[in-house]
């Protein structure tokens, strides 16, 4: 939980004080992670909880375990409720904390229907930013699995998200492989009962149709959001990126602006609007 994380020499250090007993210290990693996710959620850090889960799943594909995650988190909340309640006699202020953990444990067991939300748009329109802003609001805590084409492309290439790839990594065959991987992961996550936010350009009508078909086959709700932005803003956004999983450049934006996008029947949103997030949330209801 959050009490077992400290900053040491400027770096986060996790400790559990259980090193004396391997039977306690060595457990299922997803169950261990559930403690941190639960505590972040309880402390009002839903976005951080979702981000943490997604970065873990990027590194270790445990999609099949997602069906158990709400139960794991509920168990962790119940444990914190019990431990905190036993301290309430000497520390009365902890009674409210124990009750809050107990209520959270109940809430975490409420079933949520899986759904697929897809965010498309040309480079520099803010797809990834919106995806992460929405993810913690969807499905069971700590929110949706975010599948980003930029991160998946780097993973398929065997490099870190921040590593820039050569031009051939964006050839048609390579891009087709990225979209195929994204859709396969989306299908697997939906099958596990989780919600998904997919983030990619989806410039081709066939790509948009294919991702919608994933939702239809899974029998879940589908929402497609298409972001549109002033070209000058798009150019400025990609030019300002540092250490970003996206390799898009101003030249890439210029090329994309000439695409024939076909008919876009997704909900179109002005990516430059101050109330973009609010409009996106409304589109999901």
Label each PLM-derived region with a short phrase.
Residues 7-53, 57:
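Active-site Asp-x-Gly
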Residues 47-109:
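Helix-rich C-terminal or lid/interface subdomains of diverse kinases
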Residues 119:
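Hydrophobic anchor at the beta1->P-loop junction of P-loop NTPases
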Residues 127:
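Conserved lysine of the Walker
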Residues 130:
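Hydrophobic positions on the alpha1 helix immediately C-terminal to the Walker A/P-loop
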Residues 135-194:
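Conserved substrate/cofactor phosphate-moiety recognition/catalytic segment
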Residues 218-238:
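Conserved phosphate-donor/acceptor-positioning beta-strand/loop module used by diverse small-molecule
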Residues 240-285:
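Small-molecule kinase domains that catalyze NTP-dependent phosphoryl transfer to phosphate-bearing small molecules
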